[in-house]
């Protein structure tokens, strides 16, 4: 089966609320495809209530829409999990003087009313009968000739779903068929559950754009130009910066309508952290999107330089249907003819301090400031230290060396050999622990230089990863 496909009968396993959310997400994607905000779609309430209430309401502020799965700019969707024969249709929308006021209002506004029935998979004659039942029910309304009516069965719903890859990722995840690692728009920076995840725009993080002649912008100054660049270029966009500067959260903000103006279309966003070896691979996913001509913005976090270069060439050659954003801590040999590079860096502790107070409110302002200063604004390091602060403890009198010991030892007994091995591993920018294609064994070379056997260094790497001191990118590791 193709990546962006699903058996239509699998949708029967959706709950009532999931069905309503699916239709809402599809409506948002359809509205966004027409160049309007997904905020034009509203949905809430009980899907099972037979009261003619509105499940999903689309209100696009224009006079006419280009025909598609949405025909009128004002459209009401009624979502039903069960079958909807003629008798059920009449009960749902009423007839004559008992006609639902929702239907009458849609007719008055020359809008559209669509029943989506998951339980039905109609033949052409079956759909015709249901549409006739809907039309007969409204025939006595004075504005009935202005009302657009339609009936979407399971086949129509799956046809609509196939047009929107990001929504397909969502529904597959709900059905337990999600692809390993791939996600639609969401909290990609993975904040702890229950923690506020609004973007921190404090001074201390600067962003340099490729056309900015080296000018360093604040986050709130850079968001809109970043969006404009991603929309206009046919090149891949590479977001670089040291670990802990907030690259992923800033990319997430590009799709957030509450940040800046004219947000990127979140309904076409497809995200994956390549460090977790996704299935399908990033290459296979891009090839599929390009082959099917799907509009998508593909975000690859922790994307190695080699993978970026390979995919950037494909995106540049294909045009603008698929936009590619990759995130990584370095740039290396990215080719300017296929890549726009945006660099993010920290200058000061302010953002890290605010993040600590948000994540660990009991830590106190003074401790948060001390940790952020020690970490030199690096949020990843700051969070690792803050996790080990005891209730009521003060760090004011701890030296930098003592704070480093706390970060490194993490309540384990001091281990001079492990620290020495970490120092050896930190001499290089990064190192490979296993690469069948490599001409040299990098861990073996580091072992020769240090006097430690390769297996001992390998074990050290494993321990350091458990302490979140080593980062992982495929077979690459870095202190």
Where are the regions that the model predicts?
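Amphipathic alpha-helical "lid/sensor" segments that cap RecA-like P-loop NTPase cores
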Residues: 244, 250-251, 332, 336-340, ...
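Conserved P-loop NTPase "ATPase switch" module shared by AAA+ and STAND
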Residues: 268-318
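Post-Walker A helix-loop "phosphate-sensing" segment adjacent to the P-loop in P-loop NTPases
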Residues: 35-36, 256-268
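Short capping/hinge segments at domain boundaries that bridge a core fold to an adjacent linker or tail
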Residues: 81, 245-255, 297, 441, ...
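Hydrophobic anchor at the beta1->P-loop junction of P-loop NTPases
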Residues: 239
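Sensor-1/coupling segment of RecA-like P-loop NTPase cores
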Residues: 121-124, 304-311, 315-342
């Amino acid at each position: 089966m193709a990546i962006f496909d699903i058996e239509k009968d699998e949708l029967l396993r959706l709950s009532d609320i999931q069905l309503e959310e699916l239709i809402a997400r599809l409506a948002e994607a359809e509205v966004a495809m027409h160049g309007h905000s997904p905020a034009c779609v509203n949905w809430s309430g009980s899907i099972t209530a037979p009261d003619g209430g509105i499940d999903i309401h689309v209100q696009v502020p224009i006079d006419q829409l280009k025909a598609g799965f949405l025909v009128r700019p004002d459209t009401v969707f009624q979502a039903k999990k069960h079958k909807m024969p003629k008798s059920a249709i009449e009960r749902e929308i009423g007839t004559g003087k008992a006609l639902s006021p929702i239907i009458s209002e849609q007719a008055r506004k020359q809008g559209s009313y669509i029943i989506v029935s998951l339980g039905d998979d109609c033949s052409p004659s079956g759909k015709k009968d249901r549409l006739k039942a809907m039309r007969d029910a409204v025939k006595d309304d004075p504005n009935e000739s202005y009302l657009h009516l339609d009936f979407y069965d399971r086949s129509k719903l799956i046809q609509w779903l196939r047009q929107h890859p990001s929504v397909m990722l969502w529904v597959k995840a709900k059905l337990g068929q999600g692809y390993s690692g791939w996600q639609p728009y969401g909290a990609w920076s993975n904040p702890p559950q229950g923690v506020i995840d609004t973007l921190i725009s404090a001074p201390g993080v600067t962003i340099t754009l490729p056309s900015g002649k080296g000018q360093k912008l604040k986050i709130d100054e850079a968001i809109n130009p970043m969006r404009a660049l991603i929309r206009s270029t046919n090149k891949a966009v590479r977001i670089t910066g040291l670990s802990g500067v907030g690259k992923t959260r800033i990319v997430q903000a590009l799709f957030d309508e509450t940040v800046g103006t004219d947000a990127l279309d979140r309904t076409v966003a497809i995200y994956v952290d390549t460090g977790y070896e996704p299935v399908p691979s990033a290459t296979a996913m891009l090839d599929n999107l390009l082959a099917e001509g799907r509009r998508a913005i593909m975000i690859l976090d922790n994307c190695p330089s080699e993978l970026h270069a390979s995919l950037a060439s494909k995106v540049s050659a294909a045009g603008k249907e698929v936009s590619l954003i990759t995130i990584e801590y370095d740039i290396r040999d990215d080719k300017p003819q296929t890549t726009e590079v945006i660099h993010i860096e920290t200058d000061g502790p302010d953002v890290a301090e605010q993040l600590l107070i948000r994540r660990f409110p009991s830590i106190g302002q003074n401790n948060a400031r001390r940790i952020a200063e020690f970490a030199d604004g690096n949020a990843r390091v700051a969070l690792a230290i803050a996790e080990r602060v005891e209730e009521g403890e003060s760090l004011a009198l701890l030296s930098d060396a003592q704070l480093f010991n706390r970060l490194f030892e993490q309540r384990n007994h001091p281990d001079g050999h492990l620290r020495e091995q970490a120092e050896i591993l930190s001499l290089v920018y990064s190192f490979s622990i296993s690469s069948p294609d490599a001409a040299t064994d990098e861990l073996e070379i580091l072992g020769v230089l240090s006097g430690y056997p390769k297996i001992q260094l390998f074990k050290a790497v494993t321990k350091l990863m458990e302490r979140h001191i080593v980062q992982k990118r495929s077979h690459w590791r870095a202190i």
